[in-house]
């Protein structure tokens, strides 16, 4: 049983995937998109460290590890034009419109901003998926990848708790996946209350909330079987 709020729940490593949401330079490194857009990323380094430890345990326990990278083609066709709400609400797109010298640099595949942070390089057997909107289920292969492997439980880490983490967990709930977020392996985009609100939403309506210590304590002694 994995200790969690609002109650502990059974988690079988063979049917569990750890989802790493958007641990890219854009969201976790100084000079990345979130930093340039004025968001506080001071907690990102600790989150990176926590995720690294979680992934070591997850792999040893035989869990599937899935990395997401958020962004678009270098021409931003996938981002949508003015006819898309994403064009209006994406802070990356708004930042580039306000600062034309950044055009083509933020969240574009092939650019430093898009790449995963150095400390979270995927290992052999890990899966890497691309997404173009907040939810990892939108226009991606995630659902088919999970179903093909018999995955029923998703453990979420990454940035930002209140945006892409929560969006993906919510969509997973609608598709009958059990979702748990490791609260100290996530970081919000915005003030501290946003993190608390997102975690409240998750544990009350859409899933469960646990910690990296409880995850590692539950699965750290397991070997794949």
From Swiss-Prot:
This is Ureidoacrylate amidohydrolase RutB. GO terms for molecular function: hydrolase activity, acting on carbon-nitrogen (but not peptide) bonds, in linear amides. Its EC number is 3.5.1.110. It is an enzyme of class 3 (hydrolase). NCBIfam families: RutB. Belongs to the isochorismatase family. RutB subfamily. Pfam families: Isochorismatase. The active site is at residues 22, 131, 164. Keywords: Hydrolase. It comes from Caulobacter vibrioides (strain ATCC 19089 / CIP 103742 / CB 15). Signal peptide: none annotated. CDD domains: cysteine_hydrolases. It catalyses: (Z)-3-ureidoacrylate + H2O + H(+) = (Z)-3-aminoacrylate + NH4(+) + CO2; (Z)-3-ureidoacrylate + H2O = (Z)-3-aminoacrylate + carbamate + H(+); (Z)-2-methylureidoacrylate + H2O + H(+) = (Z)-2-methylaminoacrylate + NH4(+) + CO2. Hydrolyzes ureidoacrylate to form aminoacrylate and carbamate. The carbamate hydrolyzes spontaneously, thereby releasing one of the nitrogen atoms of the pyrimidine ring as ammonia and one of its carbon atoms as CO2. The gene is rutB. The keyword Kinase does not apply. GO terms for biological process: nitrogen utilization; uracil catabolic process. InterPro entries: Isochorismatase-like_dom, Isochorismatase-like_hydrls, Isochorismatase-like_sf, RutB.
């Amino acid at each position: 049983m994995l200790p969690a709020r609002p109650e502990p729940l059974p988690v079988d490593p063979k049917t569990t995937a750890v989802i790493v949401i958007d641990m890219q330079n854009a969201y976790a490194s100084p000079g990345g998109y979130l930093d340039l857009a004025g968001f506080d990323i001071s907690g990102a380094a600790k989150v990176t460290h926590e995720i690294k430890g979680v992934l070591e345990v997850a792999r040893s326990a035989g869990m599937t590890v899935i990395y997401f990278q958020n962004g678009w083609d270098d021409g931003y066709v996938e981002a949508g034009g003015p006819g898309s709400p994403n064009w209006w609400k994406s802070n990356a797109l708004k930042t580039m419109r306000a600062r034309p010298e950044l055009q083509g640099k933020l969240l574009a595949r092939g650019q430093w901003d898009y790449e995963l942070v150095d400390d979270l390089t995927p290992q052999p057997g890990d899966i890497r998926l691309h997404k173009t909107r907040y939810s990892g289920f939108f226009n991606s292969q995630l659902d088919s990848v999970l179903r093909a492997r018999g995955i029923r439980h998703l453990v979420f880490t990454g940035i930002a708790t209140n945006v892409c983490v929560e969006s993906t967990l919510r969509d997973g709930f609608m598709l009958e996946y059990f979702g748990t977020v490791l609260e100290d392996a996530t970081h919000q985009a915005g003030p501290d209350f946003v993190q608390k609100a997102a975690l409240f939403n998750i544990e009350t309506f859409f899933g469960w909330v646990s910690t990296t210590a409880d995850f590692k304590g539950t699965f750290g002694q397991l070997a794949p079987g």
